[in-house]
Regions:
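General beta-strand recognition
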Residues: 38, 93-95, 133
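A short, polar/charged loop-to-alpha-helix boundary motif
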Residues: 47-61
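Short, basic/aromatic recognition patches
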Residues: 2-24
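Short, structured beta-strand-loop surface elements
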Residues: 59-119
Length: 140
């Protein structure tokens, strides 16, 4: 199913599916809702999970804590039905567009795992201008 990585051009411009798994054998997966386009979760797949996802048209991920493939929603009933799979230009990240109906994706019960909002103004770095202090360069 997955092809050997032969050349950069073939990977970036060709039709070969040749995912680049990291040193732990994983590839990151961003999952979004096909209807609302909201980000549902970030997960990981190993080779087996990726193949099962393609074959079954339902999302399978690698659980880094349990060290096993899990069929998303098998226990909760909120199966992620695959509508589209994309892989990025150098094939080291995957994007799933899924249908979850009215279900949730987060293991704590929320529709999206990204349910927390961080007020960005509280976490911005001071601009370099603010860090200069009160001395201005002298003009000659």
């Amino acid at each position: 199913m997955f092809k050997k990585r032969e050349s950069v051009t073939e990977i970036e411009e060709g039709n070969l599916l040749s995912p680049k798994f990291d040193n732990d054998g994983l590839i990151p997966v961003v999952t979004t809702c096909v209807n609302t386009k909201e980000i549902l979760m970030l997960g990981y797949m190993n080779v087996d999970a990726f193949k099962k996802t393609i074959e079954t048209k339902e999302a399978h991920y690698w659980s880094r804590s349990r060290k096993q493939v899990w069929h998303k929603g098998k226990t909760s009933g909120f199966i992620q039905k695959i509508k589209e799979i994309r892989i990025d230009d150098d094939q080291d990240a995957v994007w799933l567009s899924v249908d979850i109906g009215n279900g949730s994706s987060c293991h704590v019960g929320y529709r999206s795992c990204f349910y927390r909002s961080i007020p960005c103004l509280l976490y911005t770095s001071p601009s370099p201008r603010d860090q200069r202090g009160s001395r201005m360069p002298s003009s000659a």
